[in-house]
Amino acid sequence: CGGKGTSGGKDASADKGSVYYLNFKPEADAQWQELAKIYEEETGVKVTVVTAASGQYETTLKSEMGKSECPTLFQVNGPVGLASWKDYCADLSDTEVYKQLTSEDFALKDGDKVAGIGYVIESYGIICNKKLLAEAGYSMDDIKNFADLKKVAEDITARRDELGFDAFTSAGMDGSSDWRYKTHLANLPVYYEYQADGINNTKAIKGTYLDNYRQIWDLYINNSTTDPKQLSVKTGDDAVAEFVAGKAVFYQNGTWAYSDISSVGDENLGMLPIYIGVDGEENQGLCTGTENYWCVNAKASEADIKATEDFMAWLATDDTALKAICGSQGAMPSGADGMGFVTPFKKNLESDNLLVNIASQYVADGKTPVSWNFTTMPSETWKNEVGSALTVYASDQTDANWDLVKKAFVEGWATESQAAGN
């Protein structure tokens, strides 16, 4: 894309450079468009925001980087994403946005170079409708490990006709939802294997905890609103609709889903860790981390790089920008809802997202957050193969079909790591 050098000889606005942000989060598109306009009005610097469709970010980024007007601000998901794009990542170690981080842990490093800046910290687990749980005769305090969760879920299933609801929302394996299982749920066996082996990355996963992965997947799909054979066509929106309508008690998702489900009422919402039956999991918290790192395109013009770094600094420090990013209801200048993110920046605002505050409470209570190790999964192909195998298994739950999940997980990891040169 565009070459190095200044934009001398162009009109005054060109000298300021411009920003092209390729946004990863479709659910925040409207807010980013509004912030871009505000920044442009304040500074005269043009900011273009393009949002990739769900699950299409890498494909879109590759396509856009091949154009003459390519993104100046893009994102990677962590070490694996960085490996593909490190030649495009400018060093951000001297930038204001880097200085605004509360911890080095939120910077993505490539040797000594700061290649990416984490801009949102998120947590996920099992979101719970406490009102329905109480109607079934239980409270959150009754669920401290996998055995407890299984007992409660199976009891709800046994009484579903009497209760009028199910234990879990549909575990949709359509492209809008399958990431919750092939990536987020799959993080748990990876996390526990890394913990057991004292590592934070590997070219060859052993699959030590895949029996645990199977038992939580079995629990999800056999105690839900939907016949497991129908999961391939179930969407993320289906799961939201089921949860909001009070058709299920439990819904695996994260803090980012708050605005989708807030109509259930804060007093009725809780969040549980994803228990998979590992010793000591009573001390486990939610899965907390980031796979959202901002990177600045090193191949953009100097003026555009400077403009982009200035835009990032504004996002991390400006009151209006931070309110839009951290706030929820009515937080945008237009009166629309904000993004509801937690940022790792010094000026982060306290959230009015209940799920974020629940995540913070787990930490305050001394529970150990589960780190996001799915950023070390070797490729999208690996995730897709695991997802396909999970879907096949759901429709016919045989040991032979689970062996296909194990094969995709273990052999697929080695194959994809080798292919990526990781």
Which residues fall in each region the model found?
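C-terminal capping/gating helix-and-loop segments adjacent to ligand/active sites or protein-protein/ligand interfaces
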Residues: 118, 353-414
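Extracytoplasmic/periplasmic substrate-recognition and gating elements
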Residues: 37, 42, 46, 136, ...
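Glycine-centered hinge/linker elements that transmit conformational signals in sensory
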Residues: 153-154, 199-233
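Hinge/lid segment of periplasmic solute-binding proteins
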Residues: 77-128, 180, 184-186, 270-273
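A structural signal for short loop-to-beta-strand junctions that line the ligand-binding cleft
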Residues: 64, 71-72, 98-133, 164-166, ...
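Conserved N-terminal structural module of periplasmic/extracytoplasmic solute-binding proteins
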Residues: 1-81, 97, 232, 281, ...
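Short, solvent-exposed loop/beta-turn-alpha elements that line the ligand-binding surface or hinge
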Residues: 91-105, 168, 172-175, 190-215, ...
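Extracytoplasmic/periplasmic solute-binding protein
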Residues: 115-119, 124, 150-202, 248
